[in-house]
Amino acid sequence: MGGKYRENASLDVARNVPGFDIVLMGHDHARECKKVQNVAGDSVLVMDPASNGIVVSDIDITVTLRNGKVTDKQIDGVLTETAPYGISGEFMKRFSPQYATIQDFVSKRIGRFTKTVSTRPAYFGSSAFIDLIHTLQLDISGAEISLAAPLSYDTQIKEGDIYVYDMFNLYKYENMLYTMKLSGKEVHDALEMSYDLWTNRMTSPDDHILLLRDQPREGAADRAAFKNFSFNFDSAAGIIYTVDVTKPCGSKVTILSMADGTPFHMDKMYTVAL
């Protein structure tokens, strides 16, 4: 985030910590299969199967022993597609009751959308997609202010009947709704940080409004070029505010009032849903 943290600590370990033959990476959702040379001059295999189980890390290790000691080793790796292996009948039989229970739950109709909503407009301003999350958070929690971000980079819920499974397009993971007591200043500062991660400081109409990477992330040259992850791009509801993208961090956000027109105070404590 914002250049404050190591993006690829696993590669740093492979290159700078002697003693490893293989480093298995994960979490960053970018495929990797290559050998790097560490500071001791040894070869280290680095592998990352990315996400969703589409491929797995497949490694062959051949070791030659002499008098109980390793005299030679050959290490090779490939990313192997899982699709050709098909579905395990034994696995499906074992978990069929649980599968049926989940299918029944996620197939419940819970409403209807009169038009398709997408995360894409959320990066440029108010959007129906994020407004829905804000509305739900405020209504369910009774909070005064809501903070929410597009947790899925590019997704949509199509016009028509809406089912429980569609809600995973809103919030894909097991995130729970919480309320916190925050001062007005803390709300303001949280938004300042969000828009600093989200928006570029524009100096002319030709500048990008979004904060984009100068160079692709290592191992993900084909990825969209946000400098920071979109799930950090929090907007707020329950307040009326403006964002001036020509201003520096700390001066971008101006909170004008609460949504009902009553004054917003920096030193007042507010209940915030997130």
Q: Residue spans of the language-model regions?
A:
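Functional cores that coordinate and move charged inorganic groups
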Residues: 1-100, 128
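Short N-terminal signal/transit or membrane-insertion segments
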Residues: 1-3, 89-105, 188, 192-201, ...
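Short N-terminal helix-initiation segments at or just after the protein's N-terminus
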Residues: 5-7, 119-126, 213-218
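Generic detector of short, locally flexible boundary/turn motifs and exposed helical patches
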Residues: 9-14, 22-28, 109-115, 143-147, ...
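Generic preference for hydrophobic/aromatic residues in regular secondary structure cores
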Residues: 18, 33, 41, 46, ...
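Feature captures C-terminal
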Residues: 38, 43-44, 127, 131-274
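A short C-terminal boundary segment appended to hydrolase-like catalytic domains
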Residues: 62-162, 170, 246-248, 267
